[in-house]
């Protein structure tokens, strides 16, 4: 079985980001990503720090904004950042405080700066096959499959999870690669048998070790998007110990989808800066 090392793939993408950041700098442009952090959630803070640290290594300027208080104040912060011509990309960390929805927040992010595909218009453009930034986690799934040379065209793909951040957008991205996609969720009947027919399984539910060996046909590729912190550390949707004896390829947790997601946010920021 191949373990699909997201860290090494992220490093490859990072070399491209460094080169492009240097070209922009030579033209007098500093690619800048604004991270809006309206929550005191420790995991969100931790991830914001990872983004900031990674950005610094590849030549992208990262600025953290920590608005607190009423939803209106948070939206005002997003509007201020959106109007700043020196900012090229914007992401808003979740969970959001009460009184704010992802849709409302996304509508305040201009699509040209929406490097994590949070604006509903970005998802709509994705569905229509128009240029847009896809949510970075969903894009990371396709990036990993592409770099691992796992064929998507004609492949049967089972996506477990139908959320707007991963399940729906990754299904659209896979359809664009000519895959045959089945979306499964909590109401799906016969989930195990459906998954077992797939050449590729993408699981994004947040339910630890949901996907066992019985889900996986021999040789299938399994992309584990789930991340849950337990007393023993991070675990994913996939029971890696069981699945590794059956799958042909598997992303680890941690070290799989996560590092690629972070680097794609920075690559998107570069692309947004280039288009500005």
From Swiss-Prot:
GO terms for cellular component: cytosol. SUPFAM superfamilies: Aminoacid dehydrogenase-like, N-terminal domain, NAD(P)-binding Rossmann-fold domains. Keywords: Amino-acid biosynthesis, Histidine biosynthesis, Hydrolase, Methionine biosynthesis, Multifunctional enzyme, NADP, One-carbon metabolism, Oxidoreductase, Purine biosynthesis. Signal peptide: none annotated. It catalyses: (6R)-5,10-methylene-5,6,7,8-tetrahydrofolate + NADP(+) = (6R)-5,10-methenyltetrahydrofolate + NADPH; (6R)-5,10-methenyltetrahydrofolate + H2O = (6R)-10-formyltetrahydrofolate + H(+). One of its GO terms (biological process) is tetrahydrofolate interconversion. The keyword NADP applies. One of its GO terms (molecular function) is methylenetetrahydrofolate dehydrogenase (NADP+) activity. Catalyzes the oxidation of 5,10-methylenetetrahydrofolate to 5,10-methenyltetrahydrofolate and then the hydrolysis of 5,10-methenyltetrahydrofolate to 10-formyltetrahydrofolate. This is Bifunctional protein FolD 1. It comes from Frankia casuarinae (strain DSM 45818 / CECT 9043 / HFP020203 / CcI3). The gene is folD1.
């Amino acid at each position: 079985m191949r373990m699909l090392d997201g860290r090494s793939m992220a490093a490859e993408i990072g070399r491209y980001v460094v080169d492009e950041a240097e070209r922009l700098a030579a033209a007098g442009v500093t690619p800048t990503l604004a991270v809006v952090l309206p929550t005191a959630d420790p995991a969100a803070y931790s991830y914001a720090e990872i983004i900031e640290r990674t950005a610094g290594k590849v030549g992208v300027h990262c600025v953290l904004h920590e608005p607190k208080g009423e939803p209106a104040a948070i939206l005002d912060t997003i509007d201020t950042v959106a109007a700043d011509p020196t900012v090229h990309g914007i992401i808003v960390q979740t969970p959001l405080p009460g009184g704010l929805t992802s849709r409302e927040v996304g509508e305040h992010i201009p699509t040209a700066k929406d490097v994590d595909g949070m604006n509903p218009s970005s998802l709509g453009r994705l569905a229509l096959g128009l240029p847009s930034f896809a949510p970075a986690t969903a894009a990371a799934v396709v990036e990993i499959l592409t770099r691992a040379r796992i064929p998507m065209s004609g492949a049967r793909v089972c996506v477990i999870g139908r959320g707007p951040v991963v399940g729906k957008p990754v299904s659209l991205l896979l359809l664009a690669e000519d895959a045959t996609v089945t979306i499964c969720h909590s109401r799906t009947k016969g989930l195990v048998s459906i998954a077992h027919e797939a050449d590729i399984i993408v699981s994004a539910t947040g339910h630890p070790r949901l996907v066992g060996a019985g889900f996986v046909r021999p040789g299938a590729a399994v992309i584990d998007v789930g991340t849950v912190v337990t007393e023993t550390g991070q675990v994913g949707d996939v029971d890696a110990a069981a699945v590794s004896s059956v799958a042909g390829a598997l992303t680890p947790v941690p070290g799989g989808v996560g590092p690629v997601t972070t680097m794609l946010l920075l690559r998107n920021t570069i692309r947004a800066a280039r288009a500005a």
